[in-house]
Amino acid sequence: MEIYDHALYPQADTFKYPKAGENNSVVTLHLVDVNTKKINEVDVGNPYYIPRIKWKNNPDELAVQTINRRQDDLKLYSVNAKKNSVSLLLEETDKAYLDITDDLTFLDDDSFIWTSERDGHNHIYLYNKDGKLKNQ
């Protein structure tokens, strides 16, 4: 792909994207203790893409989204960085395709707001801290 900027000539920029039949790039998640410099791998299951990672309100916890290559199986995990433990909060599947958004908000009590098109329309859902649906 050529990149055009203010230079006289464009520059070529390449990026790796797996073609049909090729393996995906292997993506892993690691936690680093900045005091001890110890690095721990976080096991989020299958070799999925990790499109979104964000800190939750608790500074020891991360929210990690993974999605498979077909992009029809999305999982939301809670990762405790101190304990290096992972729990599944939410899983969505679709026969065709799941859109990845930035519509994830954690509230003060660790419940969270999530948007989904699971019924064909975009709706807002409220889940408790354990991933149980409270309200649409």
Regions found by a protein language model. Give the residues of each.
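Internal hydrophobic scaffold segments of catalytic domains
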Residues: 1, 78-80
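Short, low-complexity, polar/charged sequence segments that are solvent-exposed and flexible
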Residues: 7-10, 81-84, 106-109, 132-134
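Predominantly five- to eight-bladed beta-propeller fold
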Residues: 1-41
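Conserved beta-propeller blade repeats
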Residues: 14-28, 45-67, 73-78, 88-89, ...
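Short loop/turn segments that connect beta-strands within beta-propeller blades
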Residues: 33-37, 80-84, 128-132
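Beta-propeller fold detector
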Residues: 40-43, 86-91, 134-136
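Hydrophobic alpha-helix feature that most strongly marks membrane-spanning transmembrane helices
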Residues: 67, 81, 94, 117, ...
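Intrinsic-disorder/low-complexity, polar/charged segments
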Residues: 3, 68-69
